[in-house]
UniProtKB/Swiss-Prot annotation:
Protein name, as recorded: Formamidopyrimidine-DNA glycosylase
Reactions catalysed: Hydrolysis of DNA containing ring-opened 7-methylguanine residues, releasing 2,6-diamino-4-hydroxy-5-(N-methyl)formamidopyrimidine; 2'-deoxyribonucleotide-(2'-deoxyribose 5'-phosphate)-2'-deoxyribonucleotide-DNA = a 3'-end 2'-deoxyribonucleotide-(2,3-dehydro-2,3-deoxyribose 5'-phosphate)-DNA + a 5'-end 5'-phospho-2'-deoxyribonucleoside-DNA + H(+)
Subunit and interaction comment: Monomer.
Sequence positions that bind DNA: H92, R111, K153
Function of the protein: Involved in base excision repair of DNA damaged by oxidation or by mutagenic agents. Acts as a DNA glycosylase that recognizes and removes damaged bases. Has a preference for oxidized purines, such as 7,8-dihydro-8-oxoguanine (8-oxoG). Has AP (apurinic/apyrimidinic) lyase activity and introduces nicks in the DNA strand. Cleaves the DNA backbone by beta-delta elimination to generate a single-strand break at the site of the removed base with both 3'- and 5'-phosphates.
Residues the record marks as active site: P2, E3, K58, R262
Organism annotation: Rickettsia bellii (strain OSU 85-389)
Database matches in PANTHER family: FORMAMIDOPYRIMIDINE-DNA GLYCOSYLASE
Listed cofactors: Zn(2+)
Keywords, sorted A to Z: DNA damage, DNA repair, DNA-binding, Glycosidase, Hydrolase, Lyase, Metal-binding, Multifunctional enzyme, Zinc, Zinc-finger
Annotated PROSITE patterns: FPG_CAT (PS51068), ZF_FPG_1 (PS01242), ZF_FPG_2 (PS51066)
Length: 273
């Protein structure tokens, strides 16, 4: 599933190309993605100017000048790409946004776990994103904040890192990578981390996410940016999907385990229990 760096990469690839354009027509090739698309979605955004493209957590947001926003979640396999006017719609292209410059913005989703909504812009944070915590790359993600969230939590730190009520945008890939960089065992309970470990973890999360954004995200299978280009952070992964291989830091073997049904990768030498 695309995480914060992938959605930020998508935002960066679309921002300068979409702002100022108008959506002239919306074509629904299929309206039952993860949830059924709203019948009035097209009416809320057609013939209005795009004024901003941004990200919140793992959501891409396109703001229009009529106080409506398009909210897109890529799910497991979603792609949101710009295509020329003569582009021929393919099997898993479910929504086509026809733009005023004669290009098409295509939402493609093989597994159909993606989501597209339209919502009042001014109500997004209050209502739609009401249960989301702060952004990990913000200055507010610091020692006292995370310490307060981990206090009394008898839950593995890997699970807590992926909890959107604590911090947003950190999924399976970047939780494993951040814990490895911080040298923290994924099974360690949140309540048992000391101040130095929490500070190291915050620094590791920021470091890993920032490097992944610079590399254009991680493409394991499906992810591409708005220009249909893959991400290259895959080449910098230290532990994720490297089970049985040598740790790039100490040469011990990378171990694969499970947390809440999700794969976790770590080095038992670098990340002692």
């Amino acid at each position: 599933m695309p995480e914060l760096p992938e959605v930020e990469t998508l935002k960066n690839s679309l921002e300068s190309k979409l702002i100022g354009l108008v959506i002239k027509k919306v074509e629904f090739k299929r309206d039952n993605l993860r949830y059924k698309l709203s019948a009035d979605l097209a009416d809320q955004i057609v013939n209005t100017n795009i004024i901003n493209v941004r990200r919140r957590a793992k959501y891409l947001i396109i703001d229009f000048n009529n106080n409506h926003s398009l909210i897109v979640h890529l799910g497991m396999s979603g792609r949101f790409t710009l295509q020329p006017n003569n582009y021929e719609v393919k099997k898993h292209d479910h929504v086509v946004f026809n733009l005023s410059n004669n290009e098409k913005l295509i939402f493609n989703d093989t597994r159909r776990f993606g989501m597209i909504y339209s919502f009042h812009t001014e109500l997004l944070e209050k209502d739609f994103f009401a249960n989301l915590a702060l952004e990990p790359l913000s200055d507010s993600f610091e020692l006292q904040y995370l310490k307060s969230k981990l206090m009394n939590k008898k839950v593995p730190i890997k699970n807590l890192l992926m909890d959107n009520r604590i911090v947003v945008g950190v999924g399976n890939i970047y939780a494993s990578e951040s814990l490895h960089l911080a040298k923290i065992h994924p099974d360690k309970f949140g309540k048992d981390l000391n101040d130095d470990e929490i500070k190291n973890l915050i620094a590791a999360v920021k470091n890993v996410l920032s490097k992944a954004i610079i590399a254009g995200g991680t493409t394991l299978k499906d992810f591409v940016n708005g220009d249909n280009k893959p991400g290259y952070f895959t080449q910098q992964l230290m532990v994720y999907a490297r089970d049985g291989q040598e740790c790039l830091s100490c040469s011990s073997s990378i171990i694969k385990t499970k947390h809440s049904g999700r794969s976790t990768f770590y080095c038992k030498s670098c990340q002692k229990a």
